[in-house]
């Protein structure tokens, strides 16, 4: 049987990948989670029908997300990652011995367990002794932070559903308060290449 997975971008555009088999399918309190094995990219993680990353290309996102703020900040010691349950960002952060504390705030515990099982090379970062995982909402977590972090990385998915709160005025205000005076915040931003994505990108600002 010829199996294909398709991620629909617009009524006229979709990304399709030949799929060898489905390794996992589940539904957490927050989202649908699928792991597929593909000949071209290896295993891919799919959340709510959208590809999050693959074995072949995770470094593109994770390394750019981490290395830029780490190169710019003069003396980073404490980092907060909002989202990041797959462990990819944490894995790159743990390459820096100068970091003393890495806090991961991820509401979806099922996502973390799935990634530990199917993407162990990425999830190894979650086992570093400097890493603390908090299973809670990122916006609520930030409300109790003040002058705590050198770097905040918003590694949440696009601003829909349970992540909407991480792209609001309250979130940015709380992030500013949680950062130290020379702190840096970085967050992922989808591409508005298609007209259908424009409203989502605008909502992040």
Language-model segment annotations:
Residues 1-44:
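N-terminal auxiliary segments of SAM/dcSAM-dependent transferases
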Residues 2, 53-187, 194-201, 205:
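The AdoMet/dcAdoMet-binding core of the Class I SAM-like
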């Amino acid at each position: 049987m010829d199996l294909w997975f398709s991620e629909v971008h617009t009524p006229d555009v979709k990304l399709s990948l030949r799929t060898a088999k489905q390794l996992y399918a589940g539904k957490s309190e927050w989202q649908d989670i699928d792991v597929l094995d593909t000949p071209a990219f290896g295993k891919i993680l799919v959340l709510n029908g959208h590809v999050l990353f693959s074995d072949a290309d995770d470094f593109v996102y994770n390394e750019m997300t981490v290395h830029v703020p780490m190169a710019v900040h003069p003396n980073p010691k404490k980092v907060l990652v909002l989202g990041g349950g797959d462990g990819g960002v944490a894995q790159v952060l743990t390459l820096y011995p100068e970091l003393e504390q890495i806090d991961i705030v991820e509401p979806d515990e099922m996502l973390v367990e799935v990634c530990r099982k199917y993407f162990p090379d990425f999830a190894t970062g979650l086992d570093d002794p400097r890493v603390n995982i908090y299973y809670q909402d990122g916006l609520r977590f930030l409300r109790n932070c003040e002058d705590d972090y050198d770097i905040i990385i918003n590694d949440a998915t696009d601003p829909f559903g349970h992540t909407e709160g991480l792209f609001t005025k309250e979130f940015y205000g709380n992030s500013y308060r949680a950062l130290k005076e020379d702190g840096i915040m970085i967050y992922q931003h989808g591409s508005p290449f298609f007209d259908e994505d424009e409203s989502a990108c605008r909502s992040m600002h």
